[in-house]
Design a protein with these regions (language model features):
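Rossmann-like adenosine-cofactor binding region
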Residues: 179-260, 265
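Adenosine-phosphate binding glycine-rich loop
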Residues: 228-322
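Conserved beta-strand elements of the Class I
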Residues: 132-133, 292
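N-terminal ligand-binding/catalytic initiation module
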Residues: 1-110, 116-118, 125-128, 301-304, ...
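N-terminal Rossmann-fold NAD(P) dinucleotide-binding loop
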Residues: 141-142
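Glycine-rich Rossmann-fold phosphate-binding loop(s) that bind the pyrophosphate
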Residues: 137-138
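Short helix-loop-beta connector
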Residues: 124-131, 153, 214-215
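NAD(P)-binding Rossmann-fold cofactor-contacting core
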Residues: 150-177
Length: 322
């Protein structure tokens, strides 16, 4: 029997889950070659600007396979609508039947993306962070910071954005959560003061120049998830002591790594995959003076893992489907 759950039911069980454990295990399985993930399906729109990603796959010898559809329409804030929406379909790997429809409205995608940022910071952030820099004022610009709490002891933020109204709203909302927030429209102000920087925008041209990066800086770049998007000067990756990809194969054609590769600034063999760092097959940050970059383009194994965890928690909690 197919069960259908809405976002409110999904949120009821999230507090019971160790999502970080599931996501880390997924990345490790992926880097070990135990995950089947076809190329990302996508639709890109111009007027209004937006994109839809279709990500799907399975872990070998697991119980399920998943298909996720997630949309992002970045000007929806102008018409008082969420900038993202979506759902995940979970099927049995044994007989192909649809077991669960998770009407999460992109909530699970946002959670698994924020958790990936937490995992990256755990292995790659400098030991002392006085201020966090954030590029982007919407969902991931907020969630990335909130999900860092278990691994980063810092409550000061400098946030960059294009629209002052959005910056003001971000400042007001995050200060209610206990953060100290400074807003800016000058990227250099962020890079000057922050050694941990998160980029979470749909930009299609670099926001940060290589000359602005200070020794000891870590950047988690997660906004560039299509071949059109770009947030970093490719020379930043050339200068970095360590460049980590959530999926090397996927980052060959999308994200910041693809731009640096196309420019001949880095080589594929210089890249490290996140799952190998988690598993201890590769080292994370080894010095507070290193410049490190993580390119998170979003991998289907994250969707598989979080959908599986939520589905099983909902069954165990005996929450009825809608």
């Amino acid at each position: 029997m197919t069960r259908t759950y809405n976002i409110d039911q999904i949120k009821q069980v999230m507090g019971k889950l160790d999502v970080t454990k599931y996501i880390e295990e997924g990345f490790v399985a992926y880097s070990q070659g135990r995950v089947v993930v076809p190329p990302v399906g996508e639709l890109i729109f111009e007027k209004p600007p937006g994109d839809v990603h279709i990500k799907y796959g399975y872990i070998k010898e697991d119980d399920y396979f998943a298909i996720k559809i997630a949309s992002g329409f970045y000007e929806n804030f102008k018409i008082d609508l969420p900038t993202s929406d979506g759902l995940i379909l979970l099927f049995s790997q044994r007989d192909g039947t649809l077991v669960s429809i998770l009407l999460d409205e992109c909530y699970l995608t946002n959670v698994r993306t924020a958790v990936a940022g937490r995992v990256v910071a755990k292995y790659m952030a400098p030991s002392k962070i006085d201020c966090m820099g954030v590029f982007g004022t919407v969902v991931q610009g907020r969630m990335q910071v909130e999900y860092l709490k278990p691994v980063i002891d810092c409550s000061a933020i400098i946030v960059w954005g294009l629209h002052q109204d959005n910056l003001d709203t971000y400042q007001r909302d995050m200060e209610k959560l206990g953060y100290t927030v400074q807003t800016t429209r000058d990227a250099a102000e962020v890079t000057e003061k922050c050694r941990l920087i998160i980029t979470a925008t749909p930009a299609q041209a670099p926001l940060i120049d290589v000359k602005q990066i200070k020794p000891g800086t870590h950047i988690t770049a997660m906004g560039s998830d299509t071949h059109l998007k770009q947030e970093l000067d490719p020379k930043i990756l050339q200068r970095a002591d360590m460049v980590v990809a959530d999926s090397i194969e996927q980052c060959l054609t999308r994200g910041e790594i693809s731009k640096a590769l196309q420019a001949g600034l880095i080589k594929k063999e210089d890249l490290i995959e996140l799952g190998d760092v988690i598993a201890g097959r590769q080292s994370g940050r080894t010095s507070d003076e290193q410049i490190t970059v993580a390119d998170l383009t979003g991998v289907a194994v994250q969707d598989i893992q979080i959908a599986k965890a939520v589905h099983e928690a909902l069954i165990q909690s005996d929450i009825g489907s809608v």
